[in-house]
Amino acid sequence: MNTVKEFRYMTRDEVEDAVGQFPVAILPLGATEQHGHHLPLGVDIMLAEGLARLVAKETGALLLPAVPFGYSWVWRDIPGTVSLQQHHLEAVIKDVAHSVSRYGIELLVLINGHEANTSSMKYAARELQDELAMPVIYFFYPGLSELMAEHCDSETWHGMIHACEFETSLMLVMYPEHVQMEKAVAEYPERPPLYGKSSVSLGDLSESGVYGDPTKATEEKGRLMLDAFVRIVSGNVKEAFDMTRKKERGA
């Protein structure tokens, strides 16, 4: 297995050498927002960075520092929330891509832990294709529905994951010291008729900030799902890089 090549701990010479070996960089994207009373504000950052670190180890890609803020409008009035506007996050992604492309990065991988960041990833990737001809691939827990159906016991709240069995199980694998299971509660708030068709805020629906049942979370479930995510994302990274090289050769 490869040693993880983390930007924050590397010198300029080490980065130059690493880019020469495998010109792929991973940018984790997260958010700073409430996750109930049993999980910390940084869940989305921590999970994205944890998954990204394992993928970097598996593939040899360089690991960029995580973006700690995302689009968190729905929790804007709850203490601890820090939210970026979507176009600001898109601009951050693009600026990072322009920066790393200048010294040889050929493929940027976005690993996201916060679903509301997905639009920003998509539009940044499209614009970067036009501006730099740089391939950008992006992930938000690929195969999530199938893996949850296989490994989780509780239902989601209308397909949403937030402070639920899924996220709590992953936290129990990667950061168990930051999980307070004794404070975990299940909550499935009533869904307003105009939810998804108006500016109804999630922050107004759940008393606990939980959507689902984190009390059913276990380390074993988290391990099985995490291993699957690492396998899927790592395979896609290698495939995307091979395609990039074939395109360069005109194959």
Predicted feature locations:
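Extended, histidine- and acidic-residue-enriched regions that form the cofactor-binding/catalytic faces
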Residues: 1-109, 113-251
